[in-house]
Amino acid sequence: MNRRMFKSKIHRATVTHADLHYEGSVTIDADLLEAADILPYEAVDIWNVTRGSRLTTYALAGARGSGVVCINGAAAHLNQPGDLVIIATFADMDDAEARRHTPRVLRVDGRNRPLAEQPPETPGPLAPN
């Protein structure tokens, strides 16, 4: 049996540009792609924390060290500069690999620079009984 697992994410990145007239995709600083284990042309989900929108597109590598997160094409209607987004990837794995898998989570600051400390992801608060 295969399972679809959360593979990696860039957590709370800031959209720097939105280019409605580009063909599509999201351009992301190549350093961030590498740190988050996202390849150019890999499918990514973008969850907009500011607006609540969600979409799927693919990643393109932007200039290293630029901090760029540019939403391209029609998705620019749903994401604007200054919005906070989560950029996530998923991968299909067999059951044994899925049970050993640890996703990569890259937290960034307001300028899309990796935070010095990268604490592990923890579950949210429990609902009261």
Swiss-Prot record:
Query: What species does this protein belong to?
Result: Sorangium cellulosum (strain So ce56) (Polyangium cellulosum (strain So ce56))
Describe the family membership recorded for this protein in Swiss-Prot or TrEMBL.
Belongs to the PanD family.
Tell me which UniProt keywords the record has, alphabetically: Autocatalytic cleavage, Cytoplasm, Decarboxylase, Lyase, Pantothenate biosynthesis, Pyruvate, Schiff base, Zymogen
The yes or no answer to whether the keyword Metal-binding is present is: no
A GO molecular-function term, please? Answer: aspartate 1-decarboxylase activity
User: What is this protein's record name?
Assistant: Aspartate 1-decarboxylase
Print the organism lineage: Bacteria, Pseudomonadati, Myxococcota, Polyangia, Polyangiales
| Region feature Disordered, mapped onto this chain | 99-129
Catalytic residues per the record?
Answer: 25, 58
Q: Which reaction does it catalyse?
A: L-aspartate + H(+) = beta-alanine + CO2
